[in-house]
Amino acid sequence: MVQFASRMDLLKGSEIRELLKLTAQPDIISFAGGMPAPELFPVEQMMEASRAVLEENGRVALQYSSTEGYPKLRQQIADRMLAKNNIHTDADHILVTSGSQQGLDFSARVFLDPGDVVLLESPSYLGAVNAFKACQPRFIEVPTDDGGMIMEELEKILATTERVKMIYVIPDFQNPTGRPWDLDRRHRFMEIINRYEIPVVEDNPYGELRFEGEYLPALKSLDTKGLVIYLGTFSKILAPGYRLGWVCAEEHILAKYNFMEQAASLQASTVGQMETSKWIEMFDLDAHVATIRACYDKRRKVMLETLERELPQGCTCTHPVGGLFAWVVLPEYMDAKELQMKCLEKKVAFVPGGSFFPNGGHENTLRLNYSCMPEEKIVQGITALCRTIRENLR
């Protein structure tokens, strides 16, 4: 009889990925995925960049390359982190990964032994929870509100908990709630972290997708002790199919991530890195991101206006000012998984929120994505969702 490692008992397929199989049908109005709008992918420009790479350096592009990543792309990433996040870094502090999801997996493998404690926001990104589970940690959820992680609660936990090895956070337009941390909490968080000297994994896939207000500093830009490991990605600002992300950290920490990448995949795709670098050289990434923001902002406004009009009393919704998601809290007696099945019968999909709480509970919550559906479908789908909620109120 085949015997698997005990860690496999802790792992299960992502509910979101499983749901996406159901929602692939063209007649489904899906608010389930966190996917960018495919009509915004710069396909023709990417074809030009790809052709240029293969004509100029085809044999290099199709060969193995260094684990650290394509040097020119790493420098372009460092330059953009300075321009957009005020993070002073260089190519030597950048490791290119196969998406930031791989950076999450490496973070767990670098820092966590079985029984170690991970602190994270409540709720938090399901993909990170699943990546961390393979290393068999204990999760402690830190309460949040509209300003982000509540610092008083974080201090209480740190003062009374042993074996805290890592803190995982998404300060900008958090997945699943869409909420950003306010400026004061970012500064207070770093003061606390510096006192306890615990490594922080800052996941920032949505930082450039702000629709309202001023950009706030990344935690990494406030880091004076080298405790923040910053994860970035091209998935939300260019194209997820290339599977290109990066880790930015102090060299002694980055060396451990480098070992993990050597063991896991040797390197990220050479041709993908070179084509992305060439695209950045040939075209205007800032203009492309501005186009993405304008599209998502329009869809966000339509979703929020429809929710404000249709969502029954007793339900609440966040007001995201960036990112891809809105978060709905239903009456406590309502089960979002049961609601999901009823909505799927009406060809509408969303993600039940309980999956985003690693310790369970909160089954009366749900996550909505607004980036992938055209405005008329958003109105139709949200109206149907809210009608179904009303039909199930007590």
Model-derived segments and their meaning:
Residues 314-346:
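Conserved PLP-binding catalytic core of the aspartate aminotransferase-like
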Residues 345, 359-394:
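PLP-dependent enzyme catalytic core of the Aspartate aminotransferase-like
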Residues 224-294:
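Conserved core segment of the aminotransferase class I/II
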